[in-house]
A protein has these predicted regions:
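Domain-terminus/edge residues, biased toward the C-terminal soluble/receptor-binding domains
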Residues: 95-96, 107-355
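Short, charged juxtamembrane terminal tails flanking transmembrane helices
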Residues: 357-361
Length: 361
């Protein structure tokens, strides 16, 4: 994966850092081996005081291996413990074709992933607002005024007059074994996609290979896929059973529009809806949560949507009458029972007194 590894590094660290403005001090351990391995650096120096935000930006924009090492050392105390957390997240996401041995992406036979797995890691990371801020940043000035970074992969493209507006956020990487890699969030027709390019090469006049490949893929999606409205918010999709109600069914509706991106030549027969709907006991309130609707296209799950009830369902008259009778009878029964118990106690007391009198005679 090369330096797109740093997407995983950043999200693992972000989940352990509450305050991005908290200051940390760069140590010798943070910068050691960086130059020897030929890794990219944010050019931090031992003793330098920076914020966590600076360190995250240093990992993402100039692809600083020193920044990644600083994140690991400050959050876990060592590179090894941090890498364990990286692999723990990989397992949590159910990714079976990935394993990481360092925080930077320096080549190692046991450090590997796939485009699919990297897309899932990026998708997970983009659920974190702080990560989105870092991932989509184009330029950044460090808080101590000592560093200014730019996202080089996009900067060089803009310098050569390429239109890269489709790419809203990205992380690039390169090693001789992985070649050029890029994991991006792209915007195509106002829809966001994650695009991962690996083993891309600049050759025969084909420059900015990963960006060109990403734009090519984005343009393909834009010309071969379209947004389809399958259901509108409020559409009735099914009915559910109601016990003890004036009606034995309640209508169930979808809570939001279902807009799905599908191939231009999609077949409606390939779309499948799977409902998980609750049953109810009256009274039922309007807009009460009723379950979920999963949408599949060719057996691939595209989304899960909440369901709710269309209307109120009151209790049946017989249930109401039974409750009234129960509310009257139960206190009466309890009162009678208490009276019987009291009478039995009194009777027992009287009998005992009579026995004592007889004995005295």
């Amino acid at each position: 994966p090369a330096s797109i590894t740093k997407i995983l590094t950043c999200i693992v660290a972000l989940e352990m850092v509450d305050d991005l403005d908290k200051q940390v001090t760069i140590t010798d351990s943070d910068v050691e081996t960086v130059w020897e391995t030929g890794a990219s650096a944010a050019n931090f120096t031992p003793g330098e005081v920076v914020t966590y935000r600076d360190v995250f930006m240093g990992a993402m924009l100039p692809s600083g291996a020193d920044a990644c090492r600083a994140l690991a050392n400050n959050t876990c105390g060592s590179q090894e413990k941090f890498v364990d957390k990286m692999n723990d997240l990989v397992k949590k996401l159910g990714l079976k074709d990935s394993h990481f041995v360092n925080t930077t992406g320096i080549h190692d036979p046991n450090h590997y992933t796939t485009a699919y797995d990297m897309a899932k890691i990026t998708q997970y990371a983009l659920q974190n607002e702080k990560f989105v801020e870092i991932f989509t940043r184009y330029q950044y000035n460090a808080s101590n005024g000592l560093h200014q970074w730019v996202k080089k992969v996009l900067y060089t493209c803009k310098r050569d007059h390429m239109n890269v507006s489709m790419i809203e956020g990205c992380k690039s990487g390169y090693t001789s074994d992985a070649q050029h890699t890029l994991s991006s969030m792209i915007n195509v027709n106002n829809h966001h996609y994650i695009c991962v390019v690996g083993y891309s090469k600049n050759k025969d006049g084909y420059n900015h290979c990963t960006v060109n490949d990403t734009i090519t893929l984005g343009n393909y999606v834009g010309s071969h896929y379209k947004e389809v409205n399958l259901l509108q918010s409020g559409n009735e999709v099914t009915k559910s059973s109601v016990s003890d109600g004036e009606k034995n069914k309640v209508a169930i509706k979808i809570d939001q529009d279902i807009n799905i991106v599908l191939p231009n030549d999609y077949n409606e027969k390939d779309i499948e809806y799977k409902q998980k709907v609750k049953t109810f006991t009256a009274p039922v309130k309007k807009d009460q949560h009723a379950g979920k609707l999963d949408v599949y296209y060719k057996e691939n799950k595209l989304g899960s949507y909440t369901l709710s009830t269309v209307n109120n369902v009151a209790e049946s008259e017989s249930v109401i009458m039974f409750r009234k009778i129960k509310n009257i009878l139960i206190p009466c029964v309890i009162t009678v029972f208490i009276c019987i118990v009291v009478l039995l106690i009194v009777r027992q007391f009287i009998l005992k007194r009579r026995r004592r009198r007889r004995r005295r005679r």
